[in-house]
Regions:
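Preference for solvent-exposed, low-hydrophobicity sequence contexts
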Residues: 10-11, 19-21, 221-283
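Residue-level preference for the first positions of well-ordered beta-strands
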Residues: 16-20, 156-160, 184
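The catalytic "switch" region of P-loop NTPases
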Residues: 171-243
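Structural alpha-beta junctions
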Residues: 36-46, 154-155, 175-187
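Conserved P-loop NTPase mechanochemical-coupling segment
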Residues: 88-140
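Structural motif
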Residues: 21-26, 160-166, 188-190
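Glycine-rich P-loop/Walker A and Walker A-like loops and their local beta1-loop-alpha1 context
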Residues: 1-74, 264-283
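Conserved helicase/translocase P-loop NTPase motor core
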Residues: 125-172
Length: 283
């Protein structure tokens, strides 16, 4: 297991090249810090004792549909402007915010033609990092590029931030099976996330406990005063507390919100509401 250090604390844990973030608040705090790598700035984050920076780390953000269409970022404006101009000369449109919506091969073919080069290898990593924004249209493009990036001797870390739902949208499910020491997968969890036993890591304050999801559900259900509590309903409540929360304060806030939702629910009878809210206190 490896640890990412932030503010002199073990911030997140990496297990089997996969990191599961269970709090959106923590995720955005972390993301804001780590994305400065794409602006060629140093970070305050350490990975296995080494500071992360733009020279040794590449961030690929697939955590939302909007960010998935702007995968790679760089401040190399000169090459970026040149590529834009080259594409304009061939009447190829690009979307707002300089997002180029063509495949790697199309762009490289245009560059070959513009530079009058034949059978000359172009450093794909430099090509990608030259774009302010770069969109990849299909699986093949993405994995071809990723395989080329992995070969880079300068890059020691490649962080891919993703959500399962976005992977389905992009048809990039193979991403979860990537096996390379350089690549760390950041899975952003939400209330729809499904885990296998032993797959998830839950964070409580500064202590880290590994517990299977099903065992956790069974444990709390066993303490419930409600007979035959609907497991699906309970898992929804549990997900909304744990997979958005990381410390006691956040759990208390989420518990309060859920109790308010239960209280105004006209479908549930009064006794059921009381027992359900009482069950939440065990969490």
């Amino acid at each position: 297991m490896f640890y990412l250090k932030y503010r002199n604390e073990n911030f997140f844990i990496v297990k089997n090249n996969k990191l599961i973030i269970t709090s959106y608040e923590k995720y955005y705090e972390f993301l804001k810090e780590i994305l400065v790598i794409n602006e060629s700035k140093d970070t305050k984050i350490e990975f296995n004792g080494a500071k992360l920076n733009s020279k040794n780390t590449l961030i690929i953000d697939l955590s939302s549909i909007s960010s998935a269409t702007k995968i790679f970022n760089s401040e190399n404006r000169l090459i970026n402007e040149y590529i834009k101009t080259s594409l304009d000369n061939y009447s190829m449109d690009y979307e707002k915010e300089n997002t180029i919506n063509f495949t790697i091969n199309e762009i490289m073919k245009k560059l070959y033609k513009e530079l009058q080069l034949e059978n000359v290898e172009i450093d794909i990593l430099k090509l990608i990092k030259s774009h302010t924004s770069f969109a990849i249209n299909n699986n093949d493009d993405f994995f071809v590029v990723l395989n080329e990036i992995v070969k880079s001797e300068d890059l020691k870390n490649i962080f891919i931030i993703y959500k399962k739902g976005i992977l389905d949208f992009l048809k990039l499910n193979e991403l979860e099976y990537i096996k390379n020491d350089k690549i760390i997968l950041f899975e952003i969890c939400d209330s729809n996330s499904k885990f296998k036993d032993g797959d998830n890591i839950l964070f409580f304050d500064k202590d880290i406990y590994q517990i299977t999801y099903n065992n956790l559900v069974d444990l709390i259900l066993s303490k419930s005063k409600i007979q035959d509590l609907d497991r699906e309903l309970f898992e929804f409540l549990l997900n909304n507390i744990f997979f958005y929360s990381i410390n006691k304060k956040e759990v208390d806030i989420m518990r309060k919100h859920l109790k308010e939702i239960i209280n105004i629910n006209d479908v549930l009878n009064k006794e059921f509401k009381i027992n359900l809210m009482d069950t939440l206190d065990y969490i």
